[in-house]
Amino acid sequence: MRGVPALIVALAVIGIGSAQAALPPNRATATIPPRPARLRLPPVQGPKRSDLPLVVIDAGHGGHDPGSSSSNDEQQEKTIALTIARAIRDELLESGRVRVAMTRSDDRFLVLAERREIARALHADLFISIHCDSAPNQGARGASIYTLSETSSDRVSAALAARENKADVINGVDLSGASDDVSSILIDLAQRETMNTSSAFASLLQRELAPTIGLKSTFHKYAGLMVLKAPDVPSVLLETGYISNDDDLALLTSAGYRHKLAVGVRRAIEAHFARQLVERTSDREELP
């Protein structure tokens, strides 16, 4: 956790949540569930260089959780999301500038906490969750991106968060009692810094994707999505288009569209890490 006092890092690692008095009252607090006991980590692909940034790509849904479906029920979100996630992975690996891991590379179910904690356990530098949007209004279309906020930016964002966050319960994994086991720990300013970094990356995604794919007029939205709640990994959820809209569906199932999308994501990622490198270099130069 960059910029977090050693005491707080130690508390986070060992799960102690009783040291609230150790810091001034202006520190941010967060409730973090423990990592799953049997977390299965995926392989890290790309150059064998630990100094290169690691991007974790999460294909939404999977297994017995199909996600949303097309109007004719022939296409499922879980399949389209995985295909797009693979396209982004391949584009990143071809560039050779980052390392990549996927939360799932086949049709399997993962609870939301597993997806998030895979990124944390791998010490990822960026987490991107891939989804397809859906709406009763079949005229709705366009890509959008979500970053974490406890306050949703609008009713649609709130509905999305409610729908996605219920995925574990409706698929037989009831986490409603998890709050009894969590440790309440101080995260200092790390959570806020992570959220700010996530929002900055969302802006880069908008810049790189706007010229090539159709974006919603309100491209960047905020919601309390569980999968984005890693306190130390910048995270975004990318809605690649509406599976409920026939025109968007044709794009989502098109290799050409997937390639444009993957290129835009790759460019945004490269710009993101280039910006971070410049900022770190500038910080070192300012030291006495």
Name each model-derived stretch.
Residues 1-288:
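Catalytic-site microenvironment of enzymes
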